[in-house]
Amino acid sequence: MSVVKEFREFIARGNVIDLAVGVIIGAAFNGIVKSLVDQVIMPPIGLLTGGLDFSKLEWVLRPEDPASEAIEKVAIQYGAFVNTVIQFFIVATVVFLLVKLVNEIRRQDAAEPAPAAPPAPTAEETLLTEIRDLLAKKG
């Protein structure tokens, strides 16, 4: 089997296509969540904290020396980290709710009883069937 044919079979499997779609949708969803956090959630929080922009919060370990170009500022930018943590919790919550929904649907599908088998023929019906078959053979 050629490599190209094997690759086509691999790509044609439903799981690979589903995974690719999931990755693409996940990347798009990440952009939406980032925008939600940066442009919708954090501005009101910044307003409540006196106009503080969380994405700019940092701990300066070594300040920049304007007299020397060789000494740059070294800082831990924990504000951006706070934004990223909020984004993570939003994504994790949405994924959790989706998984919970899918599991509930699967549980409901599994709980649905299979269609009942037709009742077994009575002794009278069995006897009549045998008589019909015998008459059909005699013709």
UniProtKB/Swiss-Prot annotation:
Pfam family, one: MscL
Subcellular location: Cell inner membrane
Alphabetically ordered keywords of this record: Cell inner membrane, Cell membrane, Ion channel, Ion transport, Membrane, Transmembrane, Transmembrane helix, Transport
Residue spans crossing the bilayer: 16-36, 79-99
InterPro entries (alphabetical): Mechanosensitive_channel_CS, MS_channel, MSC/AndL, MscL_channel
Subunit structure as annotated in this protein's UniProt entry: Homopentamer.
UniProt cross-references to PANTHER family, sorted A to Z: LARGE-CONDUCTANCE MECHANOSENSITIVE CHANNEL, MECHANOSENSITIVE CHANNEL MSCL
Function (record text): Channel that opens in response to stretch forces in the membrane lipid bilayer. May participate in the regulation of osmotic pressure changes within the cell.
Protein name: Large-conductance mechanosensitive channel
Name of the coding gene: mscL
